[in-house]
Amino acid sequence: METGSPGKRPVLPKRARLLVTAGMGMLALLLFGPRLVDIYVDWLWFGEVGFRSVWITVLLTRLAIVAAVALVVAGIVLAALLLAYRSRPFFVPDEPQRDPVAPLRSAVMRRPRLFGWGIAVTLGVVCGLIASFDWVKVQLFVHGGTFGIVDPEFGYDIGFFVFDLPFYRSVLNWLFVAVVLAFLASLLTHYLFGGLRLTTGRGMLTQAARVQLAVFAGAVVLLKAVAYWLDRYELLSSGRKEPTFTGAGYTDIHAELPAKLVLVAIAVLCAVSFFTAIFLRDLRIPAMAAALLVLSAILVGGLWPLLMEQFSVRPNAADVERPYIQRNIEATREAYRIGGDWVQYRSYPGIGTKQPRDVPVDVTTIAKVRLLDPHILSRTFTQQQQLKNFFSFAEILDIDRYRIDGELQDYIVGVRELSPKSLTGNQTDWINKHTVYTHGNGFVAAPANRVNAAARGAENISDSNSGYPIYAVSDIASLGSGRQVIPVEQPRVYYGEVIAQADPDYAIVGGAPGSAPREYDTDTSKYTYTGAGGVSIGNWFNRTVFATKVAQHKFLFSREIGSESKVLIHRDPKERVQRVAPWLTTDDNPYPVVVNGRIVWIVDAYTTLDTYPYAQRSSLEGPVTSPTGIVRQGKQVSYVRNSVKATVDAYDGTVTLFQFDRDDPVLRTWMRAFPGTVKSEDQIPDELRAHFRYPEDLFEVQRSLLAKYHVDEPREFFTTNAFWSVPSDPTNNANATQPPFYVLVGDQQSAQPSFRLASAMVGYNREFLSAYISAHSDPANYGKLTVLELPTDTLTQGPQQIQNSMISDTRVASERTLLERSNRIHYGNLLSLPIADGGVLYVEPLYTERISTSPSSSTFPQLSRVLVSVREPRTEGGVRVGYAPTLAESLDQVFGPGTGRVATARGGDAASAPPPGAGGPAPPQAVPPPRTTQPPAAPPRGPDVPPATVAELRETLADLRAVLDRLEKAIDAAETPGG
């Protein structure tokens, strides 16, 4: 029965065609609509922040890569398909009913162009899209320069290895992909059309199929020869000897490197043998050549280096690896700036020889000892300075310094941000959440070396109003009062770490012209945002786009949105910097500062490389846990520079990038790629520069490397005997390493306060102190590292040993039992400070937090005790422990009377009065004002008095105390009823 005219294609009815067209349109909209919306929003946002040129450059680079790779891959694959199709044989299978590919062949024959072009273009576009992620390599290759340093093996400039070689490898990989795809396409096409037939006995190839497949197979092998050639250069970043060292070792240079040349020659011969199949019908020659290449790769490329490593290198590793370890040491020091030009080493005995009060440097250090721990006091800040339930502080506060009345003082600082997660009830309504509760309020700081009053007693210590920070508040309320210790002219915070935790993260500000303010400012005032930040949604098109992006129809129908409305997005300071400078790696800890009356976030940014020859690999970022629970290591780098300091204005979100390392060739490359995006170092305001801190992420990498790379002699490096270790955190049960700490210490030359990031180091697999590393943050000496090296046979205890000694002290243990009855105990930063002309002072604040008996009650930590410890001058590792409510009393216990006065001489210690204009805990959330007067600071030290006179005065004082005791007893007896 006939169903239609022979050869006539069926035609869909008009209605069916319309439905199919509409369905395909809807599918395309679903697939590409969200991406188009994202592109348009990015266009608007990058224009708002003034970095649209970055977005355009990245987009054009990626599009160029897509076009180039797609064109090459599609062209090669299409050529392969076309050649195979045009050279197909005219054959009819002996048994057509058993031909498995007959239906597919018929379908292809009906639309050969569609299949050919469709397959080629699809493969090309997919490959192009994947390759577009290599845009960084392309930009580095195009704009890369030189380092002025050559590698020790080939004599090439380092720029070749970090700018050129990755690009060459990427190009080679995509050519390899294109040729392999073309080979597979040729193979399948010839099989489909009979050029390749598989019978029960043997396979059969037509001459055209043999020639085409041989050419593509030869091209694959030829590309493999090029890959072997490039492998030679990549040996300089070999990981064969890790974790001992990174880079080419003896085996790599004397076995792998020659093996690569041998394999290059064999691969070229193998490729030639494949090309001979064009003229020779015998395929045994290319088959034998391919077998030779595989066998050579196993024997020459694998077995030979393995045997050399096992039987020649390992038995004599210390000697044969010596020159290569030396290369690794020199390259690592250069790549991470831990060489002699940046690190100053000093011998340090570890035992004090003088009283701290007699050493000018120590007088400064003791007066500035930090007692407040930013990791512990966030909840205290929140409870006492929250004001409203929807305000909060970051989980970890920050440390910075300010010069108040000519005196440099370090502060624990935080921004009172809006916390979207804390909104409750009707506050979470869309209108309230996104148009009313839009910003935070104020900058809060507390001097890091003192609290409002010393906590006395142990039974009810949490009920006392003591041990709390002395707040210097700069917010809306204090703006007009003139009581700001740190003046802030614009205290409103629209951009921050906490405020950006909303999902989705956006706030809608502004409205119709002349409309009443609606943003919550204070209990008695509303506010309308006037900053430059934000993307306009005053027109219906933009409103529709954002409604689509966040899947919220209220963008279209809300009367709160007018012609002057804007939406604030990407409000996390770190994220903003990452988006405008995707070629930078940002530090994990942005911190707020006040500059010229404005709250500004400072974000440290790094230029990094992962192919610096011979440089040790390190993890710049901590482990990352995926949503599925898989933990992977952070970004591995072999070169890092803190080349950029970025700022984000907390009010209008303005992002500014400042050059901070003129000598960094990587930054110079990126500045050529994105001209005008990074301001020169000369444009950094002095007030901003004064708040730059040495970044923690960089310091942690450098200290872990200095633990090994302070060793100069390769043989000693190989034995690891002189290595150090980062100590474990004695206050953390998670077995984490001790975090570095910011401190103000006395400068060795001037005795003036110097802001530094520091860390103790212990011996390799030992607990005794081996070194003390500090990084300068002061503008004049920024970036210089100082390493105090203790003798190798030192008995100076390290952090863990000191912690054990302090908590096992009888006074500490006995009072701890009392404190734990109704409190949780938190140990703060264990600070290690050089002191006493060769000694080390350990200081650790102890916080207590009342155990809550009611779910509705809130508790928060307070400073209760101060522990200090120093090594005994004339004992084999013995220590003195001080334990008291104040630092002054603790110091007197370990150094004798008089040292404690140094701690209060400049307003330090637990019982110091607040500075003028500083606010105590603010009501109603704050703790009430102290009920008792605070003890005055100790008087300044007078002239020296002879010891005999001191003894006589002490005896007289003792007699007077005895008389007073008897007098009090007599009074008590007289007042006792019936007495």
From Swiss-Prot:
Residues that span the membrane, as ranges: 19-41, 63-85, 114-136, 174-196, 208-230, 261-280, 285-307
Keywords from the named record: Cell membrane, Membrane, Transmembrane, Transmembrane helix
Main subcellular location: membrane
Pro residues biased stretches: 913-946
Annotated membrane topology: Multi-pass membrane protein
Entry GO terms, CC: extracellular region; peptidoglycan-based cell wall; plasma membrane
Pfam families recorded: UPF0182
Stretches for region Disordered: 898-948
InterPro entries, sorted: UPF0182
Compartment annotation: Cell membrane
Annotated family: Belongs to the UPF0182 family.
Protein name: UPF0182 protein Rv0064
Taxonomy of the source species: Bacteria, Bacillati, Actinomycetota, Actinomycetes, Mycobacteriales
